[in-house]
């Protein structure tokens, strides 16, 4: 029987990841001069979870975590950015099998792949999805939302590049590499 649903492990990862997302979003945002745009240290964590558990978990943690954190902190949810966060997690999560973290592999090739994917994901999320959503849903001025999107792309891309890479390297180092165990004579 082919089970196409979510595993218990992934459902638990979504719940725990969303809760951690809310806490990090609340306490690790660094304001920027661009209105309503922060350096978000939660995005390396989202990239970390997406890289370990895949696209569905990445999307779900980003979407649920962002929606809850917006509602808790501001009393309302900014849906265009919530969707963009989910898409960011989803795109990064698409590469999780190629990263091969479960086998303890995160060398230069995987670091480059991870960062190319996360940069593309940031561009699509913050320069395409979020600004267009802001214009369509909230009738925001285009020049404002694209400046916010570019600022978010740069700050999130850099934070994921540095912190996300460190988190994934540390995680991979805790895994036993395939073929590293040998039977003693």
From Swiss-Prot:
Main location: membrane
A cellular component term, taken from the record's GO annotations: plasma membrane
InterPro entries: ECF_substrate-spec-like, UPF0397
Protein keywords: Cell membrane, Membrane, Transmembrane, Transmembrane helix
Pfam family, one: ECF-ribofla_trS
Membrane-traversing stretches: 11-31, 45-65, 72-92, 111-131, 146-166
Presence of keyword Transmembrane helix: yes
Keyword Cell cycle attached: no
Localization annotation: Cell membrane
Membrane topology: Multi-pass membrane protein
Top-level taxonomic group: Bacteria
Entry similarity comment: Belongs to the UPF0397 family.
Protein name: UPF0397 protein LBA0922
Species in which this protein is naturally found: Lactobacillus acidophilus (strain ATCC 700396 / NCK56 / N2 / NCFM)
């Amino acid at each position: 029987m082919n089970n196409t649903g979510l595993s218990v492990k992934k459902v638990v990862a979504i719940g725990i990841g969303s809760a951690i997302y809310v806490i990090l979003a609340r306490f690790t945002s660094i304001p920027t001069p661009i209105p309503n745009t922060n350096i978000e240290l939660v995005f390396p964590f989202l990239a970390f979870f997406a890289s370990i558990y895949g696209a569905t978990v990445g999307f779900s943690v980003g979407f649920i975590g962002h929606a809850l954190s917006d509602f808790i902190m501001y009393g309302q949810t900014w849906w265009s950015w919530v969707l963009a966060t989910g898409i960011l997690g989803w795109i990064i999560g698409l590469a999780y099998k190629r990263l091969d973290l479960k086998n303890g592999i995160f060398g230069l090739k995987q670091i480059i792949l991870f960062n190319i994917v996360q940069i593309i994901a940031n561009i699509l999320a913050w320069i395409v999805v979020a600004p267009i959503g802001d214009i369509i849903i909230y009738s925001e001025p285009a020049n404002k939302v694209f400046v916010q999107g570019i600022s978010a792309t740069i700050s999130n891309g850099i934070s994921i590049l540095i912190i996300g890479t460190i988190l994934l390297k540390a995680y991979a180092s805790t895994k036993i590499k395939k073929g590293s165990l040998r039977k003693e004579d």
